[in-house]
Amino acid sequence: MTGVFMRNIIAAVCIIFAGVSSAFASGFSIYEASVRANGMLGAFAAYADHVSTIFYNPAGLSNLNGLHISAGAVLIAPRSSFRGPLPASNREFKMEEQNFIVPNFYASYGITENLTAGIAIYAPFGLGSEWPVRWPGDETSIKSELQVIFANPAVAYTLPEFGLGKVQIGAGLQVAISGSVQLSNRVRSFAVEDNLVGLEGDLKNPAVGFNAGILISPIKELTLGFTYRSSVKVEFEGDADFNNLPAAAFPAGTGISTDIELPPSWVAAVNVKILDNLTAEVDYVCFGWSTFDQLAIGFDQTVPALVSPQSPDGQQSVSDRSYNNAFQIRGGVEYSEFGVHGLTLRGGLAYDENPVPDRTLDSIIPDSDRFEFSVGASYDVTPNFAIDAAYIYVRAKQRDSQESVAGPQGVYNTFANLPSLGFTLKI
């Protein structure tokens, strides 16, 4: 029973700390941070011709003169199902259909010909999941909701040429400025109907990291991009409530707290101008998830159910995560003036490896390797104002959880539709 209880709390905390994942069951990447970039599936680290470069590679800001503003939102419509528990049952349970709107905003201003500053505000977390009240995974999650907002001020500069061609550098701060999480689940180890564990929490303090990048263009038709996003140490605190559970094992409620260092990431990108109106890019993204090997949680009050040789006072527990490093390969193309003046078309493909090992897989984040496909377009209404649109389809590989110690044991299937719409303004 102790292990089950801890999985409930730990799974909730993992949602808010899974820095490359969104909060619904399959754990989607945060790369859906710009409508225009969505059209190329986030293959944008060497693109450097749009204000959302703040997120993908801040060095690209130095290409932008004057005032640039872009805003938009992506509608994330995940669909997930679980079949099991195996081998006893082959019954299918479907996650409730939910849709989530995740906004983004970017602005930049050219201070001089070679120096540009900007800021981005985006919400890579703003999702949730809701499973049936009675299903094999109700000890891990019935309903979860999450929202986290980031701000990312940045500055970029174009260096004087010195033999490598055009070289641009940029850096910014990534700051988690607010966040909240909720989770509810059951503890079936007790023969009490309608028992419920509820958790609500917030980011304790703003979490600060940085991103930095460089762009090198040895010739006009070729740009190489390299960018780094630092790890971020995040502090989280909240309250856990225990309803209809024995007082001898659980207090009525207690505060909880933890901190975790989110993993760093690196991107190497190549952008090639094939024709005057045709550009292609390939990005290789690596996440250092191996830093997330365990999660320690502290409790303000003694929880008798947690008393053990490892936690004699019942106020601390450590969970094994043992995540692996993971990579993404993203490719995108852009074709302008496609038969209509002012129309630009985009497309993309991506493969996204998941970091979660089989033995620590759970129903909050039953992450799986994913294939992604995208199409997008921009239309210049005027020379200074464009409408951006994109659509992404994500198909996750079927994930078998029968080796998981967290349960439930069965098979997960997940897909998602992500349409997005926004605008870009240049002054």
Predicted regions and their residues:
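Outer-membrane beta-barrel porins/channels
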Residues: 24-41, 45, 66, 82-92, ...
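Cleavable N-terminal signal peptides
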Residues: 11-12, 23
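Repetitive helical segments and hydrophobic/amphipathic motifs
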Residues: 16-17, 66
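Positively charged n-region of N-terminal signal peptides that target proteins for export
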Residues: 1-9
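N-terminal, post-signal-peptide region of Sec/Tat-exported proteins
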Residues: 50-76
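A generic, lipid-embedded transmembrane alpha helix
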Residues: 78-80
